[in-house]
Amino acid sequence: MRTVGVEEELLLVDPATGEPRALSAAVLARAFLDDSEQDVFEKELHEQMLEFATHPQADMERLHAEIVRCREEAGRHAGGIGCAVAALATSPLPVTPSIGVNRRYEWMAEQYGVVVHEQLVLGCHVHVSVDSDEEGVAVIDRVRPWLPVLAALSANSPFWQGRDSSYSSYRSRVWQRWPSAGPTELFGSAERYHRRVADMLATGTVLDDGMVYFDVRLSQRYPTVEFRVADVCLDASTAVVLAALARALVDTAAREWRAGAEPAEHSVSLLRLAAWRAARSGLTSELLHPATMRRMPAESVVRDLLEHAGEALAAAGDLERVREGVEKLLRHGNGARVQRELLARTGSLREVVAACVRRTQAA
């Protein structure tokens, strides 16, 4: 069975005011003092964020337990220096981000200017194991039209600089400012994929292959394909639903490839429109259907995703968990809806952050 690993980026906030705190270096130092052998947590581009990565897991129950544990540990380390962690993909409250200190980040700031300074956005990346680069590229070609559906399920960033953005995932719109970000055309082979990356690097526009920010890509460090479209999810259980769906999409795509089925030839222009619509309305309105690229109710598109990936979900033993998780999202809403409902109820973005801090730590 394919293994799955999850990387989550968490926002460091003041527990009293809800404002982001530039304390990632101090939190990492605290984590090292508590456990000198820990290698779970890493710094990121901005000092108001902290990243962790799980181990590869084949069992979704174990993956869920590890995500919960990592969130709890992050909260404990942050609490030791007077801040808290929140699984929020953007800060609801206004913030002036602080860029971390290292040569890579300095190069990025000089090269991209305000794009870097405004990139305090937090995502969830899912790694799914593949047998080879050839299989991985075949998967990338075949999962492309389904990625906006995953983005809609995860959407958790309605607020930007203290106001409602009108988007469910404004994080994804900010992320698209990077020159290498977004959907890709069909590659057709691993050789063409690697040639395309080499051509991009040869322009000098991106620093290295780590900055090739395709929506789904071959990992530079692991034998995996890496899904990069999701907001960090408010609930750990939603992150596991995304991970299980990503694995099922990989299994389904690999099976289609081995059977000789050709991938859908949707243009990058249409895929960008599908991604925009998912970011704009999440699960509240319509999405572009992956088969037709025409508008359909979001609930219908999500149910078609379950049907498309259902055989693989059942084979992995994940079907019931994913069905229940998806029904919960359709019934009660994704993180974006939860945040808006919190604001409507409390009238305070500070209270929104406080509630999300508590929810981040919940099992």
Swiss-Prot record:
Reaction catalyzed: L-cysteine + L-glutamate + ATP = gamma-L-glutamyl-L-cysteine + ADP + phosphate + H(+)
Keyword Plastid tagged: no
Keyword Cytoplasm: no
Broad enzyme group: ligase
A Gene Ontology biological process term: modified amino acid biosynthetic process
Keywords: ATP-binding, Ligase, Nucleotide-binding
Molecular function per GO: ATP binding; glutamate-cysteine ligase activity; ligase activity, forming carbon-nitrogen bonds
Leader peptide range in chain numbering: none
EC number: 6.3.2.2
Pfam family for this entry, one: GCS2
Similarity comment: family membership: Belongs to the glutamate--cysteine ligase type 2 family. YbdK subfamily.
Protein name: Putative glutamate--cysteine ligase 2
Organism (species): Streptomyces coelicolor (strain ATCC BAA-471 / A3(2) / M145)
